[in-house]
């Protein structure tokens, strides 16, 4: 695997920016008909990708490789910066600077794509049109939606105004992830540190406890672990949704003296008095803290939730869990955090989803069956110390699906090496360029023809 990774980085071509390209994917309403006719005559397919994060850029790059000059790829994304968010755990542990997680979005827009620096406000799938905040009307032949999750900071009273001060921090924010390590270093004998998990699904189900274990290890290395109370307050019912890993983490918590408080949902932060209020089955419970790491509630963006694309039950884009095609609109696809796929929302999941989505979109274009199926594969490297990781890999039904030749529920040095030195490079130089396929490394498991 490692040799394959190094080879990939050596041969990967440079990405050329298209940030100065005119937005030829944007037309007025009166031009829509003529533009469609021109594309039809030239056999050009227009694909609009809403969202320029991990999912959107992965799909855009893979589509560019397949469509060559027969694809008009438009990426609608307002942000000028792109973040490798899995690194924020290690930033919170003092291993990296937050600047190591940040690059310019323009450097990852495929050279054949058009970047519309805007955000979509309305989806009109019946008309094959999206409307943007700046008043643009963009038509498409195919639509890919990958807008990610919205973090609901305001759903915990007092959280927004206290974030980054009064001992309140979160590795889910670029603005506060460096504060996490500052607060860990400030812990003293007699202090209490709390780590929370909300009622909603989150980005990477194991991330809320990664910083707990780094804090535990840091305090041990500095000889005060037995004098600082660590509480894991989760709105859930277990340490992890996959039984095999949850049992190991539960045992670890008991051995390391971590207090586990399940069915504890954070509802309020009182920064001035350093108190946290939790909703429990027995009523609200107020706890004093010196440091609290908060994972905010998360969910679909309102533009998705209120659109015809949404699953009424979840608010996420309603797709077939195998093909990633929308259940109603056959020219609409979705992947990653914004989809209603019943699996953990991680970058690793996207590495498996993207080639399947691209393969099925091409099959649909060619009038072929959508025979590529996503099995729910996802992965979560759970940092258990500064040197070791439990590498959780599983698929639909929380079925274990490990890829390394050892029991991955055991703490290991090798996955930490991957997380620190391989995965970031694979993300920037492979995944976003459409040349990294997760557990399949360089080898795209989906074989589809190029469109000429």
Swiss-Prot record:
Residues annotated as binding FAD: 54-55, 77, 85, 120, 337, 345-348
Cysteines paired by S-S bonds: 204-380
Transmembrane segments: none
Cofactor stoichiometry and binding remark: Binds 1 FAD per subunit.
Signal peptide positions (record): none
Gene Ontology annotations of biological process type: regulation of sulfur metabolic process; sulfide oxidation, using sulfide:quinone oxidoreductase
Main location: mitochondrion
Record localization: Mitochondrion
Co-factor(s): FAD
Keyword Mitochondrion recorded: yes
Keyword field: Disulfide bond, FAD, Flavoprotein, Mitochondrion, Oxidoreductase, Quinone, Transit peptide
One function term, GO molecular function aspect: FAD binding
SUPFAM superfamilies named among the record's database cross-references: FAD/NAD(P)-binding domain
Reactions catalysed: ubiquinone-10 + hydrogen sulfide + sulfite + 2 H(+) = ubiquinol-10 + thiosulfate; a quinone + hydrogen sulfide + glutathione + H(+) = S-sulfanylglutathione + a quinol
Gene3D superfamilies assigned to the protein according to its UniProt record, in alphabetical order: FAD/NAD(P)-binding domain
Record flagged with keyword Oxidoreductase: yes
Domain of life: Eukaryota
Family under the similarity heading: Belongs to the SQRD family.
Reported function: Catalyzes the oxidation of hydrogen sulfide, with the help of a quinone.
Annotated protein name in UniProt: Sulfide:quinone oxidoreductase, mitochondrial
